[in-house]
Regions:
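Glycine-rich phosphate-binding/hydrolytic loop that grips phosphoryl groups
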Residues: 1-9, 13, 18, 121-141
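Short low-complexity, flexible loop/linker segments enriched in glycine and/or proline
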Residues: 28-29, 111, 136-139
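Gly/Ser/Thr-rich loops at beta-strand to alpha-helix junctions
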Residues: 99-104, 128-129
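Adenine-nucleotide phosphate-binding core of ATP-dependent small-molecule kinases
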Residues: 43-93, 124, 128
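Short acidic, glycine/proline-enriched helix-loop-strand junctions
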Residues: 103-122
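Conserved ATP-utilizing enzyme core subdomain
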Residues: 15-60
């Protein structure tokens, strides 16, 4: 997230990315199912699901829209990778940890994708410290 944001927008902190994507609009960036199905040809499908990240990047897209597009793309990549890994092992519950889990837009992506793919994303309290706790406990194995 930081690398893409720094390269594309010159923004290099999660806090600034969070702030700038608050007023972003994915309609100016991502091609979604609703753009492909004007007549609602896919009943029961979430029409806000992304068909192509940055597939509808508009010349009117603002820095805010692009920041939200980056957050959305990174979140969807994490979510779909986790979903495929869970399915490979017959699991439906996916526990998420790390700093990104504290971002409201990241959480919103997981919330939106969970019912579509019939999984449960679990974000525990203090999830941002999960990777550090794992590293600290590793020597005790």
């Amino acid at each position: 997230l930081i690398g893409l944001s720094k390269k594309m927008l010159g923004i290099d902190t999660v806090e600034h990315i969070e702030q700038i994507c608050e007023s972003g609009n994915l309609d100016n960036v991502d091609l979604r199912v609703k753009d492909l199905s004007k007549n609602h040809k896919y009943p029961g499908m979430n029409e806000d699901i992304t068909a192509s990240n940055f597939g509808k990047l508009s010349d009117i897209a603002t820095k805010h829209d692009i920041a939200l597009g980056i957050v959305n793309m990174v979140s969807e990549t994490i979510a779909t990778t986790a979903i495929f890994a869970a399915r490979a092992h017959g699991l439906k519950n996916i526990v998420l940890t790390g700093n990104l889990t504290t971002m409201p837009h990241v959480r919103a992506v997981f919330t939106a994708l969970a019912p579509t793919f019939d999984v449960n994303f679990i974000i525990p309290a203090n999830s941002q410290f999960g990777t550090v706790i794992g590293a600290a406990l590793h020597p005790f194995k």
